[in-house]
Structures are given as C-alpha cells and as structure tokens.
Amino acid sequence: MWKVNDQGFLNISVTGTKFNLIATTGKLGFYTDPPSHLIVIPLKIFPVHKFSKNEPNKKQKRFIYF
C-alpha cells in the first residue's frame, strides 16, 4: 500500500515496514521508518525508455517501475 503524505513524500507500507520514497530533481531516495539509512539513488541508473526511429520528435521520458 502506498500514499502521499502531507510533506509530499510517497509512503510505501510493506508488511508492517513503512518506506518513505523521496523524489527530487534528478535523484530518488528512500528511507525506512524508523529512519535507519537514507539512500539516494541517481535516476541515471534507471533504464530510459527509447523510442523507435519512427518517433524522433517525441521527448524521451524516464520510467520507474516498482
């Protein structure tokens, strides 16, 4: 289950452990509740969807899969 809290963070609850997902410009991070470690991941490690040569005018977008 997930929801966005008042601070704009994405809270993901997995079997009693709450993960807080922080999405900022160019970085993605998450930490557990209670906070143990903050992990910040550059978005460059996520695969970028590549369009075919028939669609050169469309901008590339980053997709994050959970």
UniProtKB/Swiss-Prot annotation:
Disulfide bonds: none
GO cellular component terms given for this protein: virion component
Chief location category: virion
Entry keywords, A to Z: Glycoprotein, Late protein, Virion
Inducing stimuli: Expressed in the late phase of the viral replicative cycle.
Residues of this chain annotated as glycosylated in UniProt: N11
Family: Belongs to the asfivirus I177L family.
The protein's name in its UniProt record: Protein I177L
